[in-house]
């Protein structure tokens, strides 16, 4: 059963989309003159219909029509594409505050709710055979895995029986379905769930997670978050994340989850809600694979080849609870200010993400927008100063507004306009008197943490000669790899390379020095070690030698050795 075998058609008699096998159902497709309407669809709920009504000045009967949305953000109403662009319309919208009030004032009637249920019940009934294949098919895919979710889950559990099964739960529709599938397939409600709370989720995501825990009290549920860092304050220090330098996930999601899971001695079999159709990068994922992101490292993806429409077919068929952000029109649920979000998601966040007595979010869209303007002012101003371009205050203000409006902050890289970027400058020079020796000046005094950073290379041996200390790093054969000479409370160090067989050794050492210079204890490094040897807790960077296997993944994982240093690096002007 391959993706190309299936198509999404419009069933005029029932006024809903149906998923059909192009070969097996060819007679029906021809006899009923069914038209393939989209590569994928999602249902449009009443709340989003209300938004469309206000945005496009539609008639009141929109609430009672069968409305669906394509992956490209095009709406299909009763089988007919709406010939209006939502992106263009929101960009041309006048008086946003008034529009927002109209959207938030919506109240559903019983008649509207009954009609919505009727549409979805027809959708479920007409697609039940397709859902049965998704759940129970024992055909094998090109990887040799069962196509049906239930036999796939059962087989994977049997194959990795010594591992602890776990569901990675994000609060989105895909992980909601995977959670339900796994617990149902195994007839076991006590499957461990872990939620990586980035502290940046949509308000309704938090409400849904609380409902999930309340309704599934037999399911052990871990909420993991970075308690030591504040996203908003980090943005002020190192700039907002961008599509080029998306530092936030490692710091606020995989880092905290890695910290918790590394404390377990068991290895995990993690069930993910990842799907190949979500992005070009995910299209290359395997259904079962190893991952360094989670301690123990095997992940299984039961819905990896499902459409969006398949996910919704399961949710509506099983009548399971889901994140109500989807009702508002969010095509995907995640961090509400993510630089990878679409214009539509950004627009919806501007409507729905605001502080009030009903949520506990750390900051809202208005505060985020104000920050973006102040940050962008520094970036734009510094760019013009560097290039000797003189602007009046009015001209500068205009360029800043354009920078924010066109989302240029999403494409930024480097620490232009940020004081912290100076910490990425490592002053170094080659020693004339000694071969393979370099003198470097740090921006911090050498301390115990400095020594800790070299434990991944091998055994540490320190010799003291008065105020001077010599740090030798030895390999497993007790042979010296390199030597670092420094004085107590000094910022100057001298590095001598002893083992010249590794031509990348000096670069690896520099990576650790970058880490020492710029470390803000963000906890991103916690996710780099699959053996639980590394931990950043309470403002301390620690490595447990008894667990470290000297794989150097913690050294090589991030560009420049440090996620923060990488985010702050400013390209030198040629």
Question: Where does each model-flagged region fall?
Answer:
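Short, well-ordered coil/turn residues that connect adjacent beta-strands
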Residues: 517, 531-532, 545-546
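Generic detector of short, aliphatic-rich beta-strand segments that form the cores of beta-sheets
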Residues: 338, 506-509, 558-565
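Short linker/helix segments within small regulatory modules
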Residues: 327-330, 535-547, 551
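Acidic, Ser/Thr/Pro/Gly-enriched interdomain connector segments
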Residues: 512-518
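Cysteine-cluster motifs in flexible loop/terminal segments that predominantly coordinate metals
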Residues: 331-347, 519-525, 551-554, 558
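Nucleotide-activated chemistry modules centered on ATP-dependent adenylation/adenylyltransferase
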Residues: 1-168, 173-447, 452-505, 512, ...
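Iron-sulfur cluster-binding cysteine motifs and their immediate structural context
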Residues: 524-540, 553-570
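Hydrophobic pocket-lining residues within nucleotide cofactor-binding pockets
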Residues: 198, 519, 548
């Amino acid at each position: 059963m391959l993706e190309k075998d299936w198509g999404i058609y419009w069933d005029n008699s029932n006024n809903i989309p149906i998923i059909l096998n192009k070969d097996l159902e060819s007679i029906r497709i021809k006899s009923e003159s069914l038209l393939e309407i989209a590569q994928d669809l999602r249902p449009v709920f009443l709340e989003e219909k209300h938004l469309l009504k206000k945005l496009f000045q539609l008639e009141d009967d929109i609430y009672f029509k069968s409305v669906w949305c394509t992956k490209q953000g095009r709406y299909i109403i009763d089988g007919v594409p709406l010939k209006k662009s939502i992106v263009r319309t929101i960009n041309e919208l006048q008086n946003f505050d008034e529009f927002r009030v109209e959207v938030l004032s919506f109240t559903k009637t019983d008649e509207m709710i009954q009609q919505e249920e009727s549409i979805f019940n027809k959708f479920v009934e007409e697609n039940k055979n397709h859902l049965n294949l998704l759940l129970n098919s024992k055909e094998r895919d090109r990887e040799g895995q069962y196509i049906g979710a239930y036999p796939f889950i059962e087989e994977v559990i049997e194959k990795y029986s010594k591992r602890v099964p776990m569901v990675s739960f994000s609060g989105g529709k895909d992980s909601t379905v995977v959670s339900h599938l796994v617990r149902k397939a195994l007839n076991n409600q006590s499957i461990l769930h872990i939620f990586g709370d980035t502290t940046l989720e949509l308000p309704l995501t938090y409400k849904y997670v609380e409902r999930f825990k309340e309704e599934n009290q037999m399911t052990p549920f871990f909420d993991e978050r970075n308690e030591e860092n504040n996203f908003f304050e980090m943005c002020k220090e190192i700039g907002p994340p961008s599509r080029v330098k998306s530092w936030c996930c490692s710091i606020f999601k995989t880092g905290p989850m890695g910290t918790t899971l590394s404390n377990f001695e068991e290895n995990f079999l993690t069930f993910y809600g990842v799907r190949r159709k979500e992005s070009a990068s995910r299209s290359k994922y395997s259904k079962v694979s190893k991952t360094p992101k989670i301690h123990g490292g095997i992940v299984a993806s039961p819905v990896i080849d499902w459409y969006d429409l398949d996910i919704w077919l399961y949710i509506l068929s099983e009548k399971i609870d889901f994140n109500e952000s989807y009702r508002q029109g969010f095509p995907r649920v995640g961090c509400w200010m993510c630089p990878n979000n679409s214009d539509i998601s950004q627009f919806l966040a501007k409507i729905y993400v605001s502080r009030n007595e009903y949520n506990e979010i750390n900051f809202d869209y208005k505060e985020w927008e104000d920050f973006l303007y102040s940050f962008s002012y520094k970036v734009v101003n510094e760019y013009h100063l560097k290039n000797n371009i003189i602007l009046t205050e009015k001209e500068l203000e205009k360029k800043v507004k354009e920078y924010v409006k066109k989302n240029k902050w999403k494409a930024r890289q480097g620490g232009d306009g940020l004081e912290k970027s100076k910490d990425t400058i490592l002053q170094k020079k080659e020693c004339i008197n000694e071969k393979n020796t370099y003198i470097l000046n740090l921006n911090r005094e050498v301390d115990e943490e400095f020594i800790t950073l070299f434990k991944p290379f091998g055994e540490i041996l320190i010799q003291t000669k008065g105020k001077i200390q010599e740090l030798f790093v030895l390999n497993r054969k007790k042979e010296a790899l390199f030597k670092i000479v420094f004085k107590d409370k000094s910022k100057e160090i001298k590095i001598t390379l002893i083992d010249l067989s590794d031509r990348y050794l000096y670069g690896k050492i520099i990576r650790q020095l970058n880490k020492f210079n710029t470390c803000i204890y963000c906890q991103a490094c916690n996710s780099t070690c699959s053996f639980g040897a590394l931990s950043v807790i309470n403002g301390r960077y620690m490595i447990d030698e008894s667990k470290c296997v000297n794989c150097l993944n913690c050294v090589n994982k991030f560009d420049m050795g440090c996620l923060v240093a990488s985010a702050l690096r400013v390209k030198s002007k040629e």
